[in-house]
């Protein structure tokens, strides 16, 4: 869950 990368 990384909304600052791609949305993972």
Curated annotation (Swiss-Prot):
It comes from the Eukaryota. Keywords: Antimicrobial, Fungicide. One of its GO terms (biological process) is defense response to fungus. Antifungal activity. Inhibits mycelial growth of F.oxysporum, M.oxysporum and P.piricola. Inhibits cell-free translation with an IC(50) of 28 uM. Antiproliferative activity against MBL2 and L1210 tumor cell lines in vitro. This is Pleurostatin. It comes from Pleurotus ostreatus (Oyster mushroom).
């Amino acid at each position: 869950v990384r909304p600052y990368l791609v949305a993972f």
